């Protein structure tokens, strides 16, 4: 069970599934939404995610995409698309070290002064689809 929430504690969540798609995204939308040079995300099935306290504010940042954040302190919490999955900001976890990133995505939009030096795979856009078996 993964648990986390916003800076002020008004909004809390739990994720009852193993995380996947652990990444650091460098796209302009994520950077702007979080106010940082990149943002670490992990994904869980939407059915395994629930809000435990508070109700986050929501903003449709692009067609089919809903970003949720604390209306009190502004902490960015989730990104929901149309795949039945929810991306959660890794650093909003109570223990963010428990879910390390596996790669960097959208590095074509990476800021020139944001140097990646961790040796993880880096993809200019999203990560490539798994090879067909």
Question: Model segments located where?
Answer:
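A short Gly-Trp-Pro
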Residues: 1-133
């Amino acid at each position: 069970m993964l648990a986390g929430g916003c800076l002020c504690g008004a909004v809390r969540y739990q994720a009852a599934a193993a995380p996947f798609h652990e990444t650091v995204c460098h796209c302009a939308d994520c950077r702007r939404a979080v106010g940082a040079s990149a943002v670490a995300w992990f994904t869980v099935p939407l059915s395994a995610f629930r809000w435990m306290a508070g109700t986050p504010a929501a903003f449709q940042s692009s067609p089919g995409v809903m970003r949720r954040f604390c209306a009190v302190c502004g902490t960015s919490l989730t990104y929901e698309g149309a795949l039945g999955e929810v991306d959660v900001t890794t650093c909003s976890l109570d223990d963010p070290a428990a879910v390390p990133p596996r790669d960097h995505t959208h590095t074509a939009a990476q800021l020139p002064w944001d140097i990646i030096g961790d040796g993880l795979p880096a993809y200019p856009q999203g990560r490539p689809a798994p090879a067909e078996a």
